[in-house]
């Protein structure tokens, strides 16, 4: 039997079972749980390699994959493992062992490599599902490219451009604006979903927006987050199977957090920036993260907690919410939202799996290109501060890695009823995939695929003789010029009303579903329900009498060494 050294094997095919990989410059170590590629039968493209006619490429005709990613190290809530990934017509059709069953053992019938199959060599690369950002203020279309090149492939939120309403609230108000945004975004290489304005006690006004194509409703305090609009929006949501997102009442004008909880009345709801610096009942909105019917999210400016977090928030808040620093009441409003104690608790609650989702709050107290970056910075900070999770050991951080990747992939997908389409690497799902070199994981992807087509990549000088000479910058690829490799997420009611046809939309529209029959217990690796207490004088956060807090830090992983400053 021919043998190969471990070093040579890893250089040729990437890591295998029980090998460990460090994620960029963090202290997070993953361990490969399983390798499906079958030793001695691995497939690889290139000079002197085996993906050739009659070898690992079948000579037969058949309905074979359009694209196979070979020897991919998959990091997903479903596991951390190595496999080949097959894509056909934009969807994942197989995960396992690819090749030619005429001469190779163990080949998955859905992963037969044929003449029509192209190859992406994923040896030594990490593959994740595309990120999902559910807190987008659609202030500028330039956000889309910024998010895409960070590894985000789905954007859900509201807005129409830099209006005062959009700058402050994630609402696309009314049928006219919803139709306009569905049309305006159909040629971008990104999945979109738009939230209608939920701030109305008029059920017909809410219903009109859902029929127009909104995938959900957003309630925001700047429009008045009263008990009546909360109840009305949730009634319509239950009737039409859409999600409601909420930014609650910082000033407690219409009631306190207990009144909002009462108005919600046990119905499922997605709470934005549940810590409160981004907005919400002062000082105790964070209590809502502990309820089973609440799907709690953070926005990224407060994550992770650093020495600069508090200082930068005041100016951000004044701009985003149309406040004036010459007006005393406006300054006091801003100050009430920024509490070091609850911000310090947020990191720990994420690490415990109490907070479930990470998002951006793009250009409205959030950074659209840093959802993934800050998720992994937070995971690393928490490992350094709190040590290994009890579910992990001293050798790897697989449980923590699954917990944190779920926060921006499968959990936001579940929350908004799109998990049957996107959010994980599973057969039958849309092939929105991101490829990373381990040394750049979480910071700078190597390739971004939408619907199985390459839409973005780090690429070198176009006039160079090879694709790698500097300057290496992100560029749109050919797949970015299509519209069939991206989705619009809309309501079923809008499909029943033939809205895509009436608007002559070019891209595929699919319905959100199962938004109302879920709870926090359905969220992956982040399903903890706790009784959270907030001291009204000191703002300290406790669970079962234990102080929940974390330290602000002076430095982070995935920071300056990766960026030109």
Curated annotation (Swiss-Prot):
Coiled coil: none annotated. The keyword Ribonucleoprotein does not apply. It is an enzyme of class 3 (hydrolase). InterPro entries: Amidohydro-rel, Metal-dep_hydrolase_composite, Metal_Hydrolase, Urease_alpha_N_dom, Urease_alpha_subunit, Urease_AS, Urease_asu, Urease_asu_c. It comes from the Bacteria. The keyword Mitochondrion does not apply. GO terms for cellular component: cytoplasm. Ni(2+) 2 binds at residues 218, 247, 273. CDD domains: Urease_alpha (cd00375). It holds the Pfam family Urease_alpha. Binds 2 nickel ions per subunit. Substrate binds at residue 220. Its EC number is 3.5.1.5. One of its GO terms (biological process) is urea catabolic process. Residues 130-565 form the Urease domain. Keywords: Cytoplasm, Hydrolase, Metal-binding, Nickel. The modification N6-carboxylysine is found at residue 218. Ni(2+) 1 binds at residues 135, 137, 218, 361. Carboxylation allows a single lysine to coordinate two nickel ions. It is found in: Cytoplasm. Heterohexamer of 3 UreA (alpha) and 3 UreB (beta) subunits. Belongs to the metallo-dependent hydrolases superfamily. Urease alpha subunit family. This is Urease subunit beta. It comes from Campylobacter lari. The lineage of its organism: Bacteria, Pseudomonadati, Campylobacterota, Epsilonproteobacteria, Campylobacterales.
